């Protein structure tokens, strides 16, 4: 199924260069979107169906590349049980098998009460987005009428999604290009670079913030008006239907500039007066098996072009994740030449096999970061990983170069405010999808936040979190099995664990965290 899906999308991308075919594809997508909205809205308990960021009626909707970011609103009674929720996820799974621009991982489900909370704090659940900008495609409008609060803009660089475009999406695309697109197609790279810059400009306070339904391609010139290098890389792509003969080299240069732009943002961002840093010890970490350490060193040593641009390379276990995998942060020298960066990207593909690569039965993922970004106390708070400051201080081991300075954890009051925003983001993404799997948003993170708010514990290791959560909050055998499913640990078999049991345990965790945040007076 996935093989044919990739072929279909690739064929659509290539043939969309013919204007009348592109028009026909968009009309077909509009009809399919109407059918998706109708089928989902007809399910019991569903009040409304929305698409958040794009719609095939927009001229910038790209058939074969653009997807529907769906949100379903359930009435509060239906959201209390698993029947309606399970019916929604099953229906969307079925639709995704016949409609190639519907992806289950893009689905969000909220209750009517949760929608009201999101409306009260626009921009918290999803960065630079608010329900007022959603497009209804099914059911009756569940949003409140009248004037609503303005989009949340203060401290937007502390949102868990702030660094997501340049740090994750763009690096995955450039270092391991998606197989479902024509390799010479530049549109995904173009769009991600724009969205990354939009976040940075919003963080600088240069934008008049409004709920973004869809960022027009034509905004690229204005976004990069002060960056002639990036403007030159993106220029003329729209007129060429986003195809380029030098696509791979141009993608690498766009990634280089995007990382540099993020570095410039953090270089200019004021450092809080109470900031502090630590330097981890140079000793070898007990958690990293020697066989893995030796192989990683050997593979990185063979990637000479990669080491040439790195000031420091550190490794640590992926936080809140089981089974254990590795995160490798490559902290760049200042002022890396474009040719050297291109050579490094080629080396990653050739020597490592891509950004994510196998290592003796597990996996490692490499991320490039500018030195000024990594050293800034707010950088780690712009990622979706709770307690990442402590995680790095505890687990980071330097593979090459001098040990980096790691920012100290934020003050407790600032961390509580971050937890409130993180809770709304996490619940919007994860709540009604207990079998959703993602390193960026998972139950283990929620469990860690609950343990911190209730007991003051700071834990990032999945095994430690499981033991602590089991001891503190789980009393029945079925709940223990559901916990293993949610944490992706133990011997959990999804087919043997009831969807209802997993959803109930996850819902109780969200309710507990919400109550704790209300008790602290930081969530209304």
PLM regions and their residue ranges:
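Broad structural signal for hydrophobic residues in well-ordered alpha-helices, predominantly aliphatic
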Residues: 39-40, 95, 220, 469
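Conserved nucleotidyltransferase catalytic core and NTase-mimicking acidic/glycine-rich helix/loop elements
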Residues: 2-9, 147-298, 302, 309-312, ...
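Short low-polarity hydrophobic stretches
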Residues: 68-72, 130, 189, 328-330, ...
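Extracytoplasmic/periplasmic
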Residues: 30-38
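Generic "edge-of-domain/loop-turn" microfeature
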Residues: 56, 77-79, 114-116, 260-264, ...
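Short, solvent-exposed secondary-structure capping/transition elements
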Residues: 79-83, 198-206, 339
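Active-site nucleotide-donor binding segment shared across nucleotidyl transfer reactions
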Residues: 37-68, 73-80, 297-326, 332-339
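Conserved NTP/Mg2+-binding pocket subregion across the NTase superfamily
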Residues: 2-31, 82, 86-192, 263-298, ...
């Amino acid at each position: 199924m996935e093989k044919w899906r990739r072929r279909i999308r690739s064929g659509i991308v290539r043939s969309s260069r013919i204007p009348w075919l592109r028009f026909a594809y968009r009309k077909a997508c509009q009809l399919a979107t109407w059918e998706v909205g109708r089928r989902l809205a007809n399910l019991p308990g569903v009040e409304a169906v929305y698409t958040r960021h794009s719609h095939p009626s927009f001229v910038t909707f790209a058939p074969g590349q653009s997807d529907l970011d769906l949100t379903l609103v359930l009435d509060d009674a239906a959201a209390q049980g698993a029947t309606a929720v399970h019916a929604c996820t099953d229906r969307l799974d079925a639709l995704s098998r016949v409609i190639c621009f519907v992806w289950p991982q893009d689905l969000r489900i909220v209750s009517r009460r949760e929608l009201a909370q999101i409306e009260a704090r626009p921009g918290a659940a999803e960065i630079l987005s608010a329900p007022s900008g959603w497009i209804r495609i099914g059911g009756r409008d569940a949003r409140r009428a009248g004037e609503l609060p303005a989009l949340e803009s203060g401290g937007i660089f502390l949102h868990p999604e702030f660094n997501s475009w340049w740090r994750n999406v763009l690096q995955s695309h450039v270092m391991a290009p998606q197989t479902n697109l024509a390799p010479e197609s530049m549109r995904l790279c173009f769009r991600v670079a724009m969205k990354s810059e939009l976040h940075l400009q919003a963080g600088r306070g240069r934008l008049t913030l409004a709920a973004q339904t869809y960022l027009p391609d034509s905004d690229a010139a204005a976004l990069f008006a002060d960056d002639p290098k990036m403007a030159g890389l993106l220029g003329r792509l729209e007129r060429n239907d986003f195809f380029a003969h030098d696509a791979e080299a141009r993608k690498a240069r766009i990634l280089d500039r995007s990382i540099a732009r993020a570095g410039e943002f953090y270089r200019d961002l004021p450092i809080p007066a109470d900031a502090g840093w630590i330097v981890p010890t140079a000793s070898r970490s007990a958690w990293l098996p020697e066989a893995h350490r030796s192989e990683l060193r050997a593979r990185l040593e063979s990637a000479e072009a990669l080491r040439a641009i790195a000031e420091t390379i550190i490794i640590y276990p992926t936080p809140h994740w089981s089974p254990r995998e590795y995160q490798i942060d490559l902290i760049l020298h200042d002022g890396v030449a474009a040719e050297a960066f291109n050579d490094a990207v080629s080396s990653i593909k050739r020597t490592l096999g891509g950004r994510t690569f196998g290592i003796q039965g597990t996996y490692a993922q490499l991320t490039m970061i500018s030195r000024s970004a990594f050293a800034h106390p707010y950088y780690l708070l712009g990622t979706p990983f709770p307690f990442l400051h402590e995680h790095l201080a505890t687990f980071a081991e330097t593979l090459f170069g001098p040990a980096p300075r790691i920012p100290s954890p934020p003050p407790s009051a600032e961390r509580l405010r971050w937890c409130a925003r993180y809770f709304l983001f996490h619940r919007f993404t994860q709540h009604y999808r207990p079998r959703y799997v993602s390193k960026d948003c998972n139950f283990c993170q929620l469990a860690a936040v609950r343990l911190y708010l209730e007991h003051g514990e700071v834990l990032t290791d999945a095994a430690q979190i499981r033991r602590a959560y089991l001891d503190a909050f789980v009393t029945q055998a079925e709940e223990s099995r559901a916990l293993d499913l949610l944490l992706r640990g133990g011997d959990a078999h999804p087919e043997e664990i009831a969807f209802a049991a997993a959803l109930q345990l996850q819902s109780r965790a969200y309710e507990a965290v919400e109550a704790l945040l209300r008790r602290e007076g930081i969530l209304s």
